[in-house]
Amino acid sequence: MLAPKQRNQNAFHLAGVIPVAGQPLDFNFDWSDCLMPLAPNYTAVERSVIECAYAGCETIWIVCNDDVSPLIRHRIGELVYDPIWYGRVFDPRPSESRKTIPIYYVPIHPKDREKRDCLGWSVLHGAVTAFKIGAKISKWLTPNKYYVSFPYGVYEPELLRDYRKDISSTKPFYLSYKDKTIADGEYLGFTFDGKDFVRYRRVIRKEGTGMWDGSELVDNKFATKKLPVEKRYSARFFSLDKIFRSAILEDAVVSELPWYHNIDSWENYCNFIGSKNRDRIFRPTEFLLKYREFNPIGEDNEAN
């Protein structure tokens, strides 16, 4: 599953996954929690998009449901430019060599909503969607690896520029802060492949509950007793460390961040806003992060 056939490493495809759909935080605003501002005109999900761009992702998949995707799409658009290729100084025609990174918006499948739609499941759902869609088009579009950026972890996305080669390699890559990674439940970027996907998904399938009590079966097949309401579909409340605790850090590239803030609660968000590190987060140049759309087939967009 999610393991493309062997092909030339020059065709390595890194897909970025930004999980948004999940259990709500305690901000209680009318808009999605991922749209909390980090700086003037700069939101948490936009920082994640820039992080994926600096990491070298060829595509970006934002996992969000239809009730919030229009506003997120209004902020971000359908593409972002690769910051490494955008303003190359020694390129005689830099505008012609710019690389666009398409952005796709993926809703959680209706059968999974209110059943196992935690933030960790959004990561896995984004990866499997990227794989299935790419495989239907061409084997060259199936991702080799997936890079995950969480809107609720704040650090400088530009730091990923120095690790692009490590991220787009066969070795796993993890960001860490004070020796803690995604395996400890922190919102830190990391990569995974098809084998990791199966291992993470197994946690949700085996440890998550359904509607029926599997401890009492008739003919060892049929459940006849329902679980109490509060115990049904427990996977929707699974934390990141529960799902990704099996992350294999041995032989992986682990990069220690100079600073990092968790903003998954109002208290943590206030700590970031009151810290000196907030001045290190600012909206990139308009040419890099701006609402853009792909031209429809057969139509000219004169505005661009």
PLM regions: where:
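N-terminal nucleotide-binding beta1-loop-alpha1 segment
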Residues: 1-36, 42, 47, 53-59, ...
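Short, charged/polar "capping" segments at the starts of alpha-helices
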Residues: 26, 68-74, 183
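Residues in the short beta-alpha loop(s) of Rossmann-like NAD(P)-binding domains
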Residues: 41, 64-68
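Short internal beta-strands
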Residues: 60-65, 176
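Short phosphate-binding loop-to-helix
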Residues: 70-143
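Conserved core of the sugar-phosphate nucleotidyltransferase
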Residues: 137-145, 153-258, 300, 304
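C-terminal catalytic/acceptor-binding lobe
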Residues: 248, 254-304
